[in-house]
Amino acid sequence: MSGVNEIRSTFLDYFKKNGHEIVPSSPLVPRNDPTLMFTNAGMVQFKNVFTGLESRPYSTAASAQKCVRAGGKHNDLDNVGYTARHHTFFEMLGNFSFGDYFKEEAITHAWNLITKEFGIDRNRLLVTVYHTDDEAFNLWKKIAGFSDDRIIRIPTSDNFWAMGDTGPCGPCSEIFYDHGDHIWGGPPGSPEEDGDRFIEIWNLVFMQYEQLTKEERIDLPRPSIDTGMGLERISALLQGKHDNYDTDLFRALIAASVEATGVPAEGEHRASHRVIADHLRSSAFLIADGVLPSSEGRGYVLRRIMRRAMRHAELLGSRDPLIYRLLPALIQQMGRAYPELVRAEALISETLKLEETRFRKTLERGLSLLSDATSTLHKGDMLDGETAFKLYDTYGFPLDLTQDALRAREIGVDISGFTDAMQRQKAEARSHWAGSGDKATETVWFELKEKFGATEFLGYDTESAEGVIQAIVRDGKEVDSAAEGETVHIVVNQTPFYGESGGQMGDTGVIVGDAGTFDVSGTQKKGEGLFVHSGTVSKGGLKVNEAVQLTVDHDRRSRLRANHSATHLLHEALREVLGTHVAQKGSLVAPERLRFDVSHPKPMSAEELKVVEDMANEIVLQNSPVVTRLMSVDDAIAEGAMALFGEKYGDEVRVVSMGTGLHGAKANRPYSVELCGGTHVAATGQIGLIRILGESAVGSGVRRLEAVTGQGALAYLAEQDERVKALASSLKVQPGDVLSRVEGLLDERKKLERELADARKKLAMGGGSSDAGANDVQQVAGVNFLAKSLSGIDAKDLKGLADEAKANLGSGVVLLIAVSDDGKASAVAAVTEDLTGRFSAVDIVRTASAALGGKGGGGRPDMAQAGGPDGTKAKEAIEAVAAALAA
């Protein structure tokens, strides 16, 4: 059998020719599932299909699903790199049946694929079944011809599969491969089952139940099949390897790491190359799916993975950012199967490089602290939790990175102490995320969707329409009517109201019936296509099955349209000015303004913002038509339409195009082309004007633009004009002369500040004459000793004053202490050249620092500086130094 890519294709081709729909991998960030941090199994994207909440146009499917396990229940991070089969990122091959076929067909497909297509020796195979699953036991005997001793009944949860605390579940049957008696280990269920002789290669889950709570389990509407086969594991077997990292894909990544570092993947360095290869995969795919490193949630898990890889790069002697340089090797291996890697290459590379550059600034200092803290520890000892927390809080070391750094020395970490330290400092728990737990309140919308189907949206063509009330929901339950003053949610068969999504706020307006009026305060999309109108009955009452007139607030909708279209123009302008790595990370389209988050590693300059604004407004002034078309996702992408990573699109998508490019590669071509379900202006001129208010950081690698359009932009400019006029009046100049007048005032202020600082320094040292400070000079052990405590002097000026004092003394020792407004002290000691053989400025300043409540200090024998928290001890510090000189 050939390489990993061919093995993946063989699996998918087998099920395609057996009538299965080949479904692309879903993103690593689960859609509409708050219970999961990352997609960790092939069935995740089909969860609502299994539970009956969603229907698909096919009843059988197969996929190669990208998965990440690095947090929560499924956490493989600690073992990655040190074992043969642990990964943070892996591909799960699976076939699925949604009420179509069940156990017999699933077992038949599995047996035919592994013995015929893959050509695995059937005599090396054995299986497990759940201990009460007689049906599966007998089917294996019938289909595979197994004897009873090769079908092992397992009574534990190992053979009862569940995705999590809630969700689909059922008994399973696992297929094992026997590597032979030359490898230690026993069959599943035996005391030696943890050995490496018998390796699971495929898990067949017979999906029969849904776990609602810990105590409640119900039958699924239709018995179904969910199977999972790790691509890395089956590839190792088919390539004659016992270790996943010896397969062709990992060998290529490790070879790239070896070439970049010049360190062979042998001995103590073997694990480091493996960690880097694995973590490169998970990091790149997470970034491609829209996750960026941050201090919480998914972003913090990504940061942990990246920093663990960077720590191992440091172990290999790499002193410059390394991981991003390995990205081309990954894309060469996996880019054809996963084109999102190619599309996001610039963003992935820039994010990896930036994060590694930032972390390296603290990595060496953190490792130095760790080395000092463990210098007296031995094998079996524990690092205290306080130090582990300091590494986490000050140096950005995730706890597992500290554990990994101590692993080779077999030193543990006091986890309890770490947790206590975190709680004492009220630090946020960053590595776990439990989701919102709002399933119960959402169930009603899925039930209504199942009952009535999706709401027909009319809002692209009209702002007013007739409809029939299908449901009224109050406090999570259906009711027959709503009376005046009641706050409820209303579902209508068709609506012109846009439901909040894609960053655009939902419409407001009124719903009017024969005997009542409902003020719509917001509209949301629920349950995969249900439009829910929220608000209050302001007059009379409304009831289910009543015919009503729905009218959208026209002025508000117009402003929303303008702001939404502006985000498209800004998005394209940002990509032209900053680079194609720019991708939308979020947005808020409100009536008053717009907010637009994009991936970019550094602040934008004022010049860049002006160019972006000007380019977007060029398209506004074109007043070109905004064109919308319906087409397949593949056709849209082929035409160059931008899609948002992680966004869920149906078989048919809406493509919005606006403007004609005027510059570079975009010249005479459609300017902005995006997949978008929002509402837009009919022509770009209706936007009126785009004015960027500013940009800021919202997280690592994410910048936020805020802007206004149309009337909002005019109001903003009018307000700014009034401010300039008021400022001009205060300065007694014309508005056009305000800038030059302010610059003159600032120059004058700087001059006065310099003169004041010089005067303070002269006054502090006694007036500035050649004998300045003579009254402060005392004779100690026959040496001139000038010591002063100064107020109103910046610490940064102390060295200059000390140099002047040395020059005036000719021969002697100088100690100057500046006390700041907050009571802290800074000290500088200076020794003239003729005395450096007797006295060291470093020793002198450390003596002063100790008296000031500090410790340490450093510099040269002739000039050194230190500090201390207690400036009230300045006199004691001078006395301590005098005593030290006399000793």
Swiss-Prot record:
Cofactor: Zn(2+)
One Pfam family recorded for the sequence: tRNA-synt_2c
Keywords: Aminoacyl-tRNA synthetase, ATP-binding, Cytoplasm, Ligase, Metal-binding, Nucleotide-binding, Protein biosynthesis, RNA-binding, tRNA-binding, Zinc
TM helices/strands, residue ranges: none
SUPFAM superfamilies documented for this protein: Class II aaRS and biotin synthetases, Putative anticodon-binding domain of alanyl-tRNA synthetase (AlaRS), ThrRS/AlaRS common domain, Translation proteins
Reactions catalysed: tRNA(Ala) + L-alanine + ATP = L-alanyl-tRNA(Ala) + AMP + diphosphate
Annotated positions binding Zn(2+): 564, 568, 676, 680
GO cellular component, one term: cytosol
Localization of this protein: Cytoplasm
GO terms for MF: alanine-tRNA ligase activity; aminoacyl-tRNA deacylase activity; ATP binding; tRNA binding; zinc ion binding
Residues spanning the signal sequence: none
Cofactor note: Binds 1 zinc ion per subunit.
InterPro entries: aa-tRNA-synth_II/BPL/LPL, Ala-tRNA-lgiase_IIc, Ala-tRNA-ligase_IIc_anticod-bd, Ala-tRNA-synth_IIc_core, Ala-tRNA-synth_IIc_N, Ala-tRNA_ligase, Ala_tRNA_ligase_euk/bac, DHHA1_dom
Family in the record: Belongs to the class-II aminoacyl-tRNA synthetase family.
Stated role: Catalyzes the attachment of alanine to tRNA(Ala) in a two-step reaction: alanine is first activated by ATP to form Ala-AMP and then transferred to the acceptor end of tRNA(Ala). Also edits incorrectly charged Ser-tRNA(Ala) and Gly-tRNA(Ala) via its editing domain.
Protein name: Alanine--tRNA ligase
